[in-house]
Curated annotation (Swiss-Prot):
One of its GO terms (molecular function) is oxidoreductase activity. It comes from the Eukaryota. The modification Phosphoserine is found at S295. Oxidoreductase that may act on a broad range of substrates such as ketosteroids, aldehydes, ketones and sugars. Keywords: Acetylation, NADP, Oxidoreductase, Phosphoprotein. NADP(+) binds at residues 23-24, 47, 114, 158-159, 180, 207-213, 256-258, 262-266. Gene3D superfamilies: NADP-dependent oxidoreductase domain (3.20.20.100). The keyword Transcription does not apply. It comes from Arabidopsis thaliana (Mouse-ear cress). The gene is AKR4C11. This is Aldo-keto reductase family 4 member C11.
Length: 315
């Protein structure tokens, strides 16, 4: 299966695997086994983040996989993200150094700004009084230095609207390679897709299954009658159908699971396709953003007074 895996080319010339393992909400104690299983199944992209609180465990597993000869470092694409408490420019390099130490790596393939939001250094919660003013171009300049140092092969952003991404492109010396955002059949992001395509920025989709298993977001994407009907027609599961939709839309996908059977099922999305007449039916699915970022909005204490401002109307 590993030989079949597809890639998308980044504006750096590097290739990002089309299917990656998401590790958000993968609990310590189980995330390591999930990463090991995924790599052995054939996954070549592991999506991490400082905020997920599990990079130390992932690092131990990666080292063992390398030491045991299961996979070579250069065959894996490792993404991580800088958390919002480290976005003051002088803190950016230290944040990546901590992630590299935790992951036991010399470099990451991709380093993302997790949100266009800054929180007070040292805080752990999302209280409004912890939200700080953010200077995205200055933080980005510090991110660019990570590329210069070789510790990040590519840099990008996450949860950026079309407008915020456009503003960053205007200011950047090193253009963002990726915008990682929520993307699934119930939140298709057509406007952002078109903008990213026009600027050579790769869109990567987190929660491509709508975050099943979470309690704090409405996550019934896979119960869409459209998806259920198409899945039945083509003889695939609803999850595989939703994931394949993402690939055919032209973006990489980051399904998260700690169940080996589902990790395997989620990887079996290559070598077949959804016929055009069925693919067109996805346009009938009702749209709703699941991950809204309400914690980052406050009428007096945040730069973003409303969700409309946070997402620049893409809500």
């Amino acid at each position: 299966m590993a030989d079949e895996i597809g890639f998308f080319q980044l504006n750096t010339g590097a290739k990002i695997p089309s299917v990656g393992l998401g590790t958000w909400q993968a609990a310590p104690g189980v995330v390591g086994d999930a990463v090991a299983a995924a790599v052995k199944i054939g996954y070549q992209h592991i999506d991490c983040a400082s905020r997920y609180g599990n990079e130390i465990e992932i690092g131990k597993v990666l080292k063992k996989l390398f030491d045991d000869g299961v996979v070579k470092r250069e065959k894996l694409f490792i993404t991580s993200k800088i958390w919002l408490t480290d976005l003051d420019p002088p803190d950016v390099q230290d944040a990546l150094n901590r992630t590299l130490q935790d992951l036991q790596l010399d470099y990451v393939d991709l380093y993302l700004m997790h949100w266009p939001v800054r929180l007070k250094k040292g805080t752990v919660d999302f209280k409004p009084e912890n939200i700080m003013p953010i200077d995205i171009p200055s933080t980005w300049k510090a991110m660019e230095a990570l590329v210069d140092s070789g510790k990040a092969r590519a840099i990008g952003v996450s949860n950026f609207s079309t407008k915020k991404l456009s503003d960053l492109v205007e200011a950047a010396r090193v253009p963002p390679a990726v915008n990682q955002v929520e993307c699934h059949p119930s939140w298709q992001q057509h406007k952002l897709h078109e903008f990213c395509k026009s600027k050579g920025i790769h869109l990567s989709g987190y929660s491509p299954l709508g975050s099943p298993g979470t309690t704090w977001v409405k996550a019934d994407v896979l119960k869409s009658p459209v998806i259920e009907m198409i899945a039945k027609e083509i003889g695939k599961s609803p999850a595989q159908t939703a994931l394949r939709w993402g690939l055919q839309m032209g973006h990489s996908i980051l399904p998260k699971s700690t169940n080996e059977g589902r990790i395997r099922e989620n990887f079996d999305v290559l070598g077949w396709s959804i016929p055009k007449e069925m693919f067109d039916k996805f346009s009938k699915i009702e749209q709703a953003r699941l991950v809204q970022g309400t914690s980052f909005v406050h009428e007096t204490l945040s730069p973003y007074k409303t969700l409309e401002e946070l997402w620049d109307g893409e809500i």
